[in-house]
UniProtKB/Swiss-Prot annotation:
InterPro entries: Ribosomal_uS7, Ribosomal_uS7_bac/org-type, Ribosomal_uS7_CS, Ribosomal_uS7_dom, Ribosomal_uS7_dom_sf. This is Small ribosomal subunit protein uS7. PANTHER family: RIBOSOMAL PROTEIN S7. One of the primary rRNA binding proteins, it binds directly to 16S rRNA where it nucleates assembly of the head domain of the 30S subunit. Is located at the subunit interface close to the decoding center, probably blocks exit of the E-site tRNA. The gene is rpsG. Belongs to the universal ribosomal protein uS7 family. It comes from Syntrophus aciditrophicus (strain SB).
Amino acid sequence: MPRRREIAKRVILPDPKYKNILVAKFVNNLLKEGKKSIAESILYGAFDLIEKKAKESPVELFERAVNNVKPVIEVKSRRVGGSTYQVPTEVAASRRVALAIRWIISNAKDRAEKTMREKLAGEFIDAANNRGGSIKKRESVHKMAEANKAFAHYRF
C-alpha cells in the first residue's frame, strides 16, 4: 500500500455483447488462466438459459441477483489488548459488488447441475428471487455483524 498518493482505479470497459460494466466485471472474475473467451461463452450461455427458463431479460435478472447478494455490513478482526474482536464495519460500494460476484461464482461451483452454464443460470435465478447459497452467505455475514454489534465502538 503506497503512502504517498491514492492509486487510480483501473477503468473496466463494458463487455462487447451487452455493453454492461457489471457483466464485464463478472467475466473477469469468472475467467481461469486468462481464458476470457471461454469465461464469456460460459456467462453468455448462462444468459441464454435464463432467457429460456425465466422468460425475462437476462441482464436485468443478473443485476437484480447481484444487488440482492451485496452485503451492507461485515465484520473485521481488530486486536485490542491481547484479545481479538470481530468489529462490524460498513462495506464500501466497490467491495460490495466484488464480494457479491465472488459469492455467486463460488456458490454456483458447489451446485449439483452438470455444466457451469446451468450452475450459473440456476444461481442467478435463485439469487434474483432471494434464495440460494449466495443469499445464505450474505445472511450469515449480516448475522455475524449483528451478533458482534457490542464491539462496534472499536472503529478502524
